[in-house]
Regions:
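Outer-membrane beta-barrel strand-turn architecture
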Residues: 51-59, 93-99, 126-131, 160
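Mid-chain, structured segments of secreted extracytoplasmic proteins
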Residues: 63-105
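Short glycine/proline- and aromatic-enriched beta-strand/turn motifs that initiate or cap beta-hairpins
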Residues: 20-75, 87, 151-161
Length: 161
């Protein structure tokens, strides 16, 4: 099933390109590693469109429309071999000093022991230096459906704008 996800990612990117260019809002692209039960790790890739919602005295609150791709894992005793994707929407707060925090709700494509049902909740905390960010993210369905191991990831991000 792996060949399906690059095609879905391309379709999503092409569909989002006109609104992204029209709004000239920042776009974050990231890559990193995710871990789940017993530290089974894998590659992750992320993309997010972040139009400004409102400015505060010490930062900016942004809408976040994004996608996370989690590569399937081989040679594990858990059901983690299928690639999974989560498409999410939410909000992200970016302080002027670099602190970043966000939360969103999404839907998934693909099913594993770690990501096993909708909705999926995406929480983010990290730090941003101009165009570079280091973000810790957790994706989980909050035990609405079992199994629910979730994915916890560390992602290095580059901001385009």
């Amino acid at each position: 099933m792996r060949p399906v996800f690059p095609l879905l990612a391309l379709v999503a990117a092409l569909a989002l390109t006109p609104p992204v260019l029209a709004q000239s809002a920042p776009v974050d692209i990231g890559v990193g590693a995710s871990a789940t039960r017993e530290n089974e790790t894998t590659l992750v890739a992320t993309a997010a469109w972040l139009p400004e919602w409102r400015r505060t005295e010490n930062g900016v609150l942004r809408w976040e429309l994004g996608a996370v791709y989690v590569r399937g894992r081989d040679n594990t005793r858990f059901d983690l071999s299928e690639d999974a994707g989560v498409f999410h929407g939410g909000a992200r707060y970016e302080r002027d000093n670099g602190f970043v925090a966000g939360f969103g709700v999404g839907v998934q494509a693909g099913r594993t022991s770690a990501l096993s049902g909708n909705p999926q909740f995406v929480s983010t905390v990290g730090w941003r230096w101009d165009h570079v960010s280091l973000l810790a993210r957790h994706i989980s369905n909050a035990s609405i459906k079992q199994p629910n191991d979730g994915e916890t990831m560390l992602v290095a991000v580059w901001r385009f704008r």
